[in-house]
UniProtKB/Swiss-Prot annotation:
UniProt subcellular location: Host nucleus; Virion tegument
Main location: host cell
UniProt keyword Thylakoid present: no
Source taxonomy: Viruses, Duplodnaviria, Heunggongvirae, Peploviricota, Herviviricetes
Stretches for region Disordered: 307-381, 447-501
Biased composition (Low complexity): 321-338
Name recorded for this polypeptide: Replication and transcription activator
Amino acid sequence: MRPKKDGLEDFLRLTPEIKKQLGSLVSDYCNVLNKEFTAGSVEITLRSYKICKAFINEAKAHGREWGGLMATLNICNFWAILRNNRVRRRAENAGNDACSIACPIVMRYVLDHLIVVTDRFFIQAPSNRVMIPATIGTAMYKLLKHSRVRAYTYSKVLGVDRAAIMASGKQVVEHLNRMEKEGLLSSKFKAFCKWVFTYPVLEEMFQTMVSSKTGHLTDDVKDVRALIKTLPRASYSSHAGQRSYVSGVLPACLLSTKSKAVETPILVSGADRMDEELMGNDGGASHTEARYSESGQFHAFTDELESLPSPTMPLKPGAQSADCGDSSSSSSDSGNSDTEQSEREEARAEAPRLRAPKSRRTSRPNRGQTPCPSNAEEPEQPWIAAVHQESDERPIFPHPSKPTFLPPVKRKKGLRDSREGMFLPKPEAGSAISDVFEGREVCQPKRIRPFHPPGSPWANRPLPASLAPTPTGPVHEPVGSLTPAPVPKPLDPAPAVTPEASHLLEDPDEETSQAVKALREMADTVIPQKEEAAICGQMDLNHPPPRGHLDELTTTLESMTEDLNLDSPLTPELNEILDTFLNDECLLHAMHISTGLSIFDTSLF
């Protein structure tokens, strides 16, 4: 069977001599798989080591600051080609040489190294205050996505997946080279790329192909199998399709106990820009519609709002029956219990949607009972007529039992109304009754804290202060005040509202407008003060970290002549600074793409 030449054209920036050696090596490897030659006669393992060494030397000579990424991609492509040619043979012909047995372990090492460098490119850029260009960041994100998806399939054929990884890597290198020629890359970004994109360590990569007797690379299958059995193993992944006895071996790069990493502060930026993003939103949007919309930011908060106790029923089901009459006379009647349950569901569905205040009423008494005298003699509230006059001008619902934009709130049967939760106020004596005022449910003595954006001056204030500032004017407050109306006591009648004062009631959407206005004032006053304090050196804990070694490296590069060739040998002090970064072996396997995507513009790519 002829060698598969699909991936030979995907290598990055190789000389014709290296391409010729590479083609000869792949042909000899296929002949070994066909049992035309032996692995020891053509020295497959030693030639594989030399070709990987040539990839690294070529990347150091012509790859500039991102040569480590180029070398990693070329090595990954080379071992993927060997892997694809091996699995195309029959089982009895494959697995008789050292490279075929150790290929899954080497592939795991290379993919792990590729994921590490791409993760560090996104994670450590904010902590070092490095701005990633949009086109480079988008191309790097595609490379990271393909690499992470294929990390679950170490023992599978890479075929098309190999081509996707190499195509994404080629786009990254092309964008870097083009922007470097146009002078669009700063010296700080170049130093950051040289720090992040490290070269693979060939000694660790070929550790499974070293003979335990001689200490050199070997093609003896028995020595390789004996060495693999001594390596630590991991549990099989459920995503691995074709499992083998070497697919669970961990590379040595993941088992390093000696910490060589330099302390680099990891600070995910974006908290400072969160206020600006929130200020850009429309401040006049309806607070109620945003809360109940399916795609809004209050959608996850509706579960707690729907489970609030209804203002038309007591918190304890048996409290009213104990006061009004004999609770044991008809408590066992199943028909009456179903009627009460349906009435409670209907009352709870109507309560949070009414736009005008209503009087408190008791539930219908059971058959054979008499209504409570205290509730029967309660006079009609005088402020209901004023509310009806206002509702005639601006109707919201044609009928309270048929809302126009909200479905009825359903609740499972068997759950008592006195259940407690994290967002539910605990029942207390004299304050268990809640009222509905201007469409908002106000529970006494506790309320649900409204949403305030991070950084808002109301975010860390107490609940009464966050709901409304301390009034300093007269008793009748103007429109726009956030002070909630006084809640009447349970036994006292509510104060009357005249038609002249009905237009002075607060707007439920005014709270959002006030929050946006406060954020804008904070952006005009607080943010410039923070920038001035950071410039003077008076930094707080919320400010970016102080200038580190990378800024020192940038200052050193900028102080040199403009015609400095970065490919030439550097000065001793510059080499000392670079060694501090290149020894960093920080294996960060946590994906934080959101930091990189926040500055991307996919329309440019």
